[in-house]
């Protein structure tokens, strides 16, 4: 049996499974500062903001200055039928407000790096680069993180890459793993 606090005091105490909604004052400030934003909420109440790629860093800087200092994830949705096929998703968290915020921006395959704002973005952006081929401009160390350095071919998690298998030569030895 699990205990799920439901009152706001318990939620503000730090239970990430019971986040608060984006504060009304912050919503109004966002609308004034970024009138072109598209805004919505997920089923669990997480607010998402979609912005044009050129305004992404400005928006991220703005929300970071207002307490969204925890960078938790960078993911991508690949929709090959769209001209701007990649939708980058950045998940941020405010410990002061106890709420999540997802930033979204569409891309053709290139985006500004968030590493100058959030050091934690480093490896997430490298993973997206490696598996989807999205290039993060200004990233200090944009190199492969999961695939072999000599990997050739299309980025493997793109939806237009055919599903199948290719034999990969590797050997597991007792010396390697000490078993």
Regions found by a protein language model. Name each.
Residues 1-179:
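Terminal low-complexity/charged segments
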